Amino acid sequence: MGARLRSAHDKSGPELMKTSLRVLAAAVGFFALGLQFYVIAAPLEGAELTKWVIEYFCFFTILTNCLAALAMALPVMAPRSALGRFFDRPSVRTAIASYIVIVAAVYHLILRKYWDPKGWALVADVLLHYATPAMFVLDWLVFVPKGQVPWRTVVTSLAFPLVYVAWTLVHGAQTNWYPYPFVDVATLGLEQVLMNVAGLLVVFLAVTAALTGAN
């Protein structure tokens, strides 16, 4: 009896830590997403507000943070649901980890100079580009089971970035608006944008391969 209790206690410690981290990360993630939407949307009305709703979901940062928040929340809130099981897969969490690492790196190294947020916008910026990535990577390092990420994840993880690029180029061609300067066809031309995209896809492959190998 005592041995069983000790075993249960040993298991409950790491499980409690995992649950606590995921609840905190999900709360921070959803708060940051809502705050980022609000600080831009607050003064807008009518067509401008509708336009912002569409543009909000055109940012890779926003979409990736949505995935990260869902991946933290659903395995805790609905662990037996199809989505809860999906987001708890080691391969899925590894793919999202690679996306969120690239979000943080690209923002810090390339995009930060284009954006100077103040006040609540700065809070949202720090949470989306630094806090959420750090918590998700910490969760991946500590709680994703080792040796369970197949190498095909390196290739399959490209599906989301490829769909995103396709949508960005199609939407941009219709609206002449692009969410990031390195995919701005109107300014750079299609050839340069495709070269930029190819370079980023190589980075995605490299980061996912590194994470898969580390697992």
Where are these regions (language model features)?
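Juxtamembrane non-transmembrane "cap" segments at the membrane-aqueous interface
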Residues: 159-178
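Membrane-helix exit/interface motif
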Residues: 42, 71-81, 102-117, 138-145
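Alpha-helical transmembrane segments of multi-pass membrane proteins
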Residues: 27-44
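Membrane-interface transmembrane-helix boundary segments in multi-pass integral membrane proteins
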Residues: 17-18, 58, 175-210
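N-terminal membrane topogenic signal
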Residues: 10-26
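Non-cytosolic membrane-interface motifs at loop->transmembrane helix junctions
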Residues: 48-57, 88-89, 115-128, 151-155, ...
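Hydrophobic cores of alpha-helical transmembrane segments in multi-pass inner/ER membrane proteins
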Residues: 61-75, 131-141, 196-211
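Interfacial segments of alpha-helical transmembrane regions
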Residues: 83-99, 150-158
